UniProtKB/Swiss-Prot annotation:
Family: Belongs to the influenza viruses PB1-F2 family.
Region annotation Mitochondrial targeting sequence: where it falls in the sequence: 65-87
UniProtKB keywords: Apoptosis, Host cytoplasm, Host membrane, Host mitochondrion, Host mitochondrion inner membrane, Host nucleus, Host-virus interaction, Inhibition of host innate immune response by virus, Inhibition of host MAVS by virus, Inhibition of host RLR pathway by virus, Membrane, Modulation of host cell apoptosis by virus, Viral immunoevasion
Name of the protein this chain belongs to: Protein PB1-F2
Superkingdom in the source lineage: Viruses
Ranges that cross the membrane: none
Quaternary structure and interacting proteins, as annotated: Oligomer. Interacts with human SLC25A6/ANT3 and VDAC1. Interacts with host MAVS.
GO terms under cellular component: host cell cytosol; host cell mitochondrial inner membrane; host cell nucleus; membrane
Region (Disordered), start-end ranges: 1-28
Record-annotated site: Low pathogenicity: 66
InterPro entries tied to this protein: Flu_proapoptotic_PB1-F2 (IPR021045)
Pfam families assigned to the protein according to its UniProt record, in alphabetical order: PB1-F2 (PF11986)
GO biological process, alphabetically ordered: symbiont-mediated perturbation of host apoptosis; symbiont-mediated suppression of host cytoplasmic pattern recognition receptor signaling pathway via inhibition of MAVS activity
Length: 90
């Protein structure tokens, strides 16, 4: 009988429950997440990815050579307005 291969999806959607026995050995049991846990997991992963994307964007933007205080202020205000608008929509 073939063993099912773990894919990134199954690895990310299954929770490994590790229990210690009385003799100190560890046992692992895979638990399939319910829909609420799966939704929470998805939101957490997407939030982390979005934060990483924003961080990379800001690092790239701040590394520009001709950065002036005025251009920085203008850019930050535009990004803040866009971010605030998205927060109200969500």
């Amino acid at each position: 009988m073939e063993q099912e291969q773990d894919t990134p999806w199954t690895q990310s959607t299954e929770h490994i429950n590790i229990q210690k026995k009385g003799n100190g050995q560890q046992t692992q049991r895979l638990e399939h997440l319910n829909s609420t846990q799966l939704t929470d997991h998805y939101l957490k992963i997407m939030s982390q990815a979005d934060m990483h994307r924003q961080t990379v964007y800001w690092k790239q933007w701040l590394s520009l050579k001709n950065l002036t205080q005025g251009s920085l202020k203008t850019h930050v205000l535009k990004r803040w307005k866009l971010f605030s608008r998205q927060e109200w929509i969500n």
